[in-house]
Amino acid sequence: MAAGSRTSLLLAFALLCLPWLQEAGAVQTVPLSRLFDHAMLQAHRAHQLAIDTYQEFEETYIPKDQKYSFLHDSQTSFCFSDSIPTPSNMEETQQKSNLELLRISLLLIESWLEPVRFLRSMFANNLVYDTSDSDDYHLLKDLEEGIQTLMGRLEDGSRRTGQILKQTYSKFDTNSHNHDALLKNYGLLYCFRKDMDKVETFLRMVQCRSVEGSCGF
C-alpha cells in the first residue's frame, strides 16, 4: 500500500475514534463531586418516585381496613432484593467499602430496569403523573450509568459497563380489579420503595466518604 494511502487510512481511523476518545476523556475531567451530585439527584428522584407511586396506589386501591393484612401477606412482605446481601442498619453500612456499596446499589437498580417500564400501567388513569413509563426507565438507566461511572473512577479510573444482574423483579400486573394482582403490585411497590431508599442511603454514604464537605446535609 502506498504511503499516501496508508496515511489517509490512519487519518480516517483517527477521526472516527476522536469522538469516543473525547467522550472518555471528558468523563475523566468531570470532578468527582459533580458525578456524585448528579447520581444523588437521580437517586433522590427515584426514591421519591417510589414513595409517591406507593402512596398513590395504596390510596387508590387498598381499603384502609385491609391495609394491615395486605402488608403482612407473604407475597408482599418478601422482596427479591432480600436475597442480595445488603446492610440492614447504619453500622453494617459503615462497615462496607465504597465499591461494595456501589455494587449493591447497582444490583438494586438493575433489578428494577424492566419492571419500571410497566410502573404506571397499574393505574386506570394514566394521567396520575406528568411523566411516562419511558421517563421512569430512563431515570433508572441514567442512575445505573452514573453508578457505573463512579465505580470506575473509584476503582481504576475507567467507566464500568455491562449489567451484572440477570434476575429481576416480575412485571407489574395491569389487572387492577383482581385481588391477586393488587396483592402482587402492592408488594412490588413496597419493595421498590424499600430498594430505592437503600440506594439513596448507600450513595450518600459513599459521597460523604469520597467528597470533602459533602457530609453536612
UniProtKB/Swiss-Prot annotation:
InterPro entries: 4_helix_cytokine-like_core, Somatotropin, Somatotropin/Prolactin, Somatotropin_CS. It comes from the Eukaryota. Keywords: Disulfide bond, Hormone, Metal-binding, Secreted, Signal, Zinc. CDD domains: somatotropin_like. Gene3D superfamilies: 1.20.1250.10. Zn(2+) binds at H44, E200. Disulfide bonds join C79-C191, C208-C215. GO terms for molecular function: growth factor activity; growth hormone receptor binding; hormone activity; metal ion binding. Residues 1-26 form the signal peptide. One of its GO terms (biological process) is animal organ development. It is found in: Secreted. One of its GO terms (cellular component) is extracellular space. Belongs to the somatotropin/prolactin family. CSH2 sequence only differs from CSH1 sequence in 1 aa. Produced only during pregnancy and is involved in stimulating lactation, fetal growth and metabolism. Does not interact with GHR but only activates PRLR through zinc-induced dimerization. Can be found in a monomeric as well as dimeric form. This is Chorionic somatomammotropin hormone 2.
